[in-house]
Amino acid sequence: SLDGTSSYAIFKDRKERIWVTSMSGVNLYNREKDNFTRIKYLDALTIDIDQDTKGNLWFSTQGKGLFKYHPEKQIWKNYIHDHKNPNSLANNQVNCVLIDTNGEMWVGTMNGLCKYNAEEDAFETLPLEIPSHNICSIIEDQRILWLTTTKGLVRYTPGEGCRVFTKSDGLQSEQFLPNAALKASDGKIYIG
């Protein structure tokens, strides 16, 4: 059965496997047995999942950073914040992860937006001029990143800059929840 009482993300990978995140970590659906297997290595509240072009799955967690997992090789790697290393994650509370249409990985943490450099296996925390660096969700639309934060919605165009939307622009609220955004098949974006 599915572990934990809450699920945060459901993700179908390129091999049609179904992954579900929960309060206790990550679960993999077994179609033949119609049940779930807990991935034992990851014991953390896990919020989001995405898959890179090499087949690695990336899991964002609350408090334990970001995990990379290669399902075929069964190799795990944990990325955490290290205040002595400027190329580490900005914070261990990772709310969301997005692999964009160019294959670039973006990570939303409680302390900023990070961009992953695969060649150097390092992160760059972007110096965005926004009212809150607590990035809750990231959605891509036509190469523009939409970031939800705890103080508004941000439209970020890489290489160009940001525009912040607040209640004065028509938002019902400026506070958003981690990984509570979706781009539907019709192109509409839903945020919460």
Predicted regions: what they are:
Residues 1-192:
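Carboxylate-rich, polar loop motifs that coordinate divalent cations or form catalytic acidic clusters
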